Amino acid sequence: MMVTLKRTTSQDSDFNYLVTLLNKDLAEADGEILHAFYKQFNHTDKYNHIIVAYSDEKPIGCGAIKPFDDNTVEIKRMFVLQDERGKSVATKLLDALENWAKELGYFYCVLETGKKQKAAISFYTSYGYQRIPNYGQYKNIENSLCFKHNIK
């Protein structure tokens, strides 16, 4: 399988299609009430650094970075279609997002995922992300786990 990556912005229709599927996936995993709470933190209309993964011109995954502080970006909206998981698509996306963050002069990436997202937790820790205290809007949210990675 040949995977190609495209840098884009939040106006990209393929990205918005994948985010719709991600939201559906999370609503099923977390339940509607918890998903509705998290939705307020996931407005994608201002994202300028998005990567969409394709297989044979079909969008199969996405991820974004947004500034967190002067040295750090936050990884947002990481998602790979169910049928494409286990094929290194997420690794390619995360590699590309971290490389883009480096190009922009950042030193660290942070991210949040839910406690029920076992595959995501396993993926991020195997990639080198380490647990940190929950930050910002996730500070007192029991379902959230936050991670950080040094990319320099």
Each language-model region and where it sits:
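Conserved catalytic-core motifs of GNAT/GCN5-like acyltransferases
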Residues: S10, L34, V110-K115, I121, ...
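Alpha-helical interaction/dimerization surfaces of two-component signaling modules
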Residues: L18, L22-D25, W100, F123, ...
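Residues that form or flank phosphate/diphosphate-binding pockets in enzymes
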Residues: D14, S88, A119
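Acetyl-CoA-dependent GNAT
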Residues: V3-K76, L81-D83, L94-D95, N134-Q137, ...
